[in-house]
A protein has these predicted regions:
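Bacterial N-terminal signal peptides that target proteins for export
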Residues: 1-10
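Enrichment for repetitive, rod-forming helical segments
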Residues: 10-11, 90
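Alpha-helical interaction segments
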Residues: 12-13, 398
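Hydrophobic core
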Residues: 14-18
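N-terminal Sec signal peptide cleavage junction
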Residues: 21-22
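Mature extracytoplasmic enzyme cores
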Residues: 26-414
Length: 414
């Protein structure tokens, strides 16, 4: 997958100044932060922020401020991963994730797909959130890692995209390439809706018990939001997100649990024994599309270096080489950033029926949802962007295929 380089060889290369070295210096960031936002932030007895603004952008800016103030370390912990710079901050052992981010072309997709798919309202909210984080850094430079800043709109969009890949099971699916026979114990979260006819108190209850850590980048952050444009709610999100992912508004509450639908396939390719840059497709040898790029990393805690890597692409998808075998990855949401819009839309619904209508757009690639509205209607929805496959049963495992019939279209859903 990644060209292996010994630490000794790298140190020797530095000493004799071989070609390929790069010098990376830290500079305090210089950037402008908009003063256009009008937001007020109050806190209750428990310290929960109540964020009010004229517009959705004002509220998103406020969310960025409170995330930076209350959960700065959690907020920036995954920022190097989102940028494909994990190894540059955390050392050579972290370079695999940088390779994956580059292989999946996440940053070019943010620019060429995400910014075209998402509404201007959502893009402006993402920018406002980043502005809030950066404003905190600007006012408290001694409390932050200045090398991380400025946090950008692109960081926010890439972070959402990557988080949804992992929640949909990317890490679990990739593990199949090295441990096909291992079976993990199923785990998951809980959400329960009980109508008044089932309770002694004649009250209705919605329980949201998602099994997230109590802290860290995927630990819930509780907040209350209200904009004069009609976006309001109380619930939880993760540091790095400007939306409410679980919670309630004045009319409806909703909980989400990880359901892990089969939204990704891994294809084991047949490689030409006479040319490792070709794979079999419909009884013919097809050449990989090959790109080259540099991955930067830190060595010995202070030395900054880069290595040139090849990135292969097939008709089946981007390709990973592992132990002499070549695997292509195909994900149902590989060309979609609509999950951000999807979370925003469900948070503005007024009843279970509106919630179902928004969820039916299938902008969110996975998750179960349990809901209850103020009229005590309850709903359970198994959600997923599941492709219409040639052989769905075979797709539960790694697929050994050279047939184009197994290459599904991500616009064709079951």
């Amino acid at each position: 997958m990644i060209k292996k380089i010994s630490s000794t060889a790298l140190l020797f290369a530095v000493i004799i100044l071989m070609q390929g070295s790069c010098a990376i210096t830290n500079k305090n960031p210089t950037y402008k932060i908009s003063n256009q936002y009008n937001v007020s932030i109050d806190r209750d007895f428990w310290g929960i922020p109540y964020i009010k603004g004229n517009t959705d952008q004002d509220v998103a800016y406020g969310i960025g401020l409170v995330h930076a103030e209350d959960a700065y370390e959690d907020l920036v912990e995954l920022m190097p991963l989102y940028r494909g710079q994990n190894a540059l901050y955390n050392g050579l052992d972290s370079i695999d994730t940088d390779y994956l981010v580059r292989l999946l072309k996440i940053h070019s997709k943010v620019k060429n797909i995400g910014k075209q798919q998402l509404s201007q309202n959502i893009l402006s909210m993402a920018q406002a959130y980043a502005d809030g984080v950066n404003m905190y850094a600007n006012k408290h430079p001694d409390n932050v890692d200045l090398s991380i800043h400025p946090v950008t709109q692109e960081d926010v969009l890439a972070g959402s995209y990557i988080q949804h890949l992992f929640f949909a099971g990317l890490d679990r699916d990739l593990a199949q390439m090295t441990s096909r026979d291992e079976t993990s114990i199923p785990t998951g979260s809980n959400a329960i809706a009980i109508n008044s006819t089932k309770t002694d108190s004649n009250a209705s209850y919605l329980l949201i018990n998602s099994h997230q850590p109590l802290s860290g980048p995927v630990g819930w952050y509780e907040l209350n939001i209200e904009s004069e444009s009609g976006w309001h709610g109380h619930g939880g999100n993760f540091p790095g997100s400007f939306l409410i992912n679980v919670g309630f508004n004045k009319n409806i509450g909703w909980g989400a649990t990880v359901n892990r639908p089969d939204v990704m396939d891994i294809f084991e390719l047949t490689i030409n024994p006479d040319n490792a840059d070709q794979y079999l497709l419909d009884d013919k040898w097809e050449s990989f599309e090959i790109e080259e790029d540099k991955l930067a990393f830190k060595l010995f805690g202070f030395l900054r270096w880069s290595t040139k890597q090849k990135f292969r692409y097939s008709k089946f998808g981007p390709v990973i080489e592992m132990n002499g075998k070549y695997f292509a990855l195909r994900h149902m949401n590989q060309s979609s950033f609509n999950e951000i819009e999807g979370w925003y839309e469900i948070s503005k619904t007024r009843n279970v029926y509106e919630f179902e209508k928004q969820l039916a757009k299938r902008k969110i690639p996975s998750f179960n949802f349990v809901t209850m509205d103020s009229d005590r209607n309850i709903g359970y929805f198994y959600n997923g962007r599941i492709p219409n496959r040639n052989d769905a049963l075979k797709a539960r495992q790694i697929i050994s295929s050279s047939s184009s019939k197994d290459i599904w279209d991500e616009r064709d859903l079951v």
